[in-house]
C-alpha cells in the first residue's frame, strides 16, 4: 500500500480509536503525530503514520505503559498493520507499519 493511502487509513483508524477510548471513559490529548526531530531514526512520526496518545482516566494522567494495555491491544486488533508501542516500552505510541518500520 502506498504511503498516502496508509496515511488515510491511519487517520481513519486513529479517529475510530479515540472515539472508542472516549466511550470507555478515557480522555485523550493528542501528542506528536508529525515530528521533525526528537524521535528515533526512521520513526513513523516523520511520515505521519504514528501518534502519541496521552490518556487520562478519572482525571489521572496515565503515564505507565501498562495503563495503555487495554487501549494498545484494542489498537492492534483494528488492522493487521496497527502496532502499539507498549511492545517496546513506549505505551502511548500508536502506529501503522510501513516498509518494516513502526
Give a label for each model feature.
Residues 13-41, 81-85:
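Extended, low-complexity, intrinsically disordered C-terminal regulatory tails
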Amino acid at each position: 500500500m502506498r504511503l498516502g493511502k496508509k496515511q488515510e487509513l491511519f487517520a481513519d483508524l486513529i479517529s475510530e480509536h479515540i472515539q472508542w477510548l472516549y466511550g470507555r471513559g478515557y480522555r485523550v490529548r493528542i501528542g506528536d503525530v508529525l515530528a521533525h526531530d526528537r524521535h528515533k531514526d526512521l520513526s513513523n512520526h516523520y511520515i505521519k503514520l504514528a501518534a502519541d496518545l496521552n490518556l487520562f482516566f478519572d482525571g489521572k494522567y496515565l503515564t505507565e505503559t501498562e495503563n495503555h494495555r487495554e487501549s494498545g491491544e484494542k489498537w492492534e486488533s483494528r488492522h493487521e498493520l496497527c502496532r502499539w508501542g507498549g511492545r517496546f516500552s513506549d505505551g502511548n505510541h500508536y502506529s501503522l507499519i510501513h516498509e518494516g518500520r513502526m
